[in-house]
Amino acid sequence: MIINHNMSAINAQRVQGBVTGVTKNMV
């Protein structure tokens, strides 16, 4: 469970980072 939770957190952070990168490129 802990490993799965960490994986989910990493995936969420990765997606958030991708969105932030796209936003910066648009700006």
Swiss-Prot record:
Coiled-coil boundaries: none
Annotated Gene Ontology cellular component terms: periplasmic flagellum
Source superkingdom: Bacteria
Record flagged with keyword Endoplasmic reticulum: no
Keyword Transferase: no
Compartments it resides in: Periplasmic flagellum; Periplasm
Signal peptide start-end: none
Broad class of where this protein is predominantly found: periplasm
Swiss-Prot/TrEMBL keywords: Bacterial flagellum, Periplasm
Subunit structure: The flagellum consists of an outer layer composed of repeating units of FlaA around a core that contains one or all of five antigenically related polypeptides.
Function: Component of the core of the flagella.
Family the UniProt entry places it in: Belongs to the bacterial flagellin family.
Protein name as it appears in the record: Flagellar filament 34 kDa core protein
Annotated organism of origin: Spirochaeta aurantia
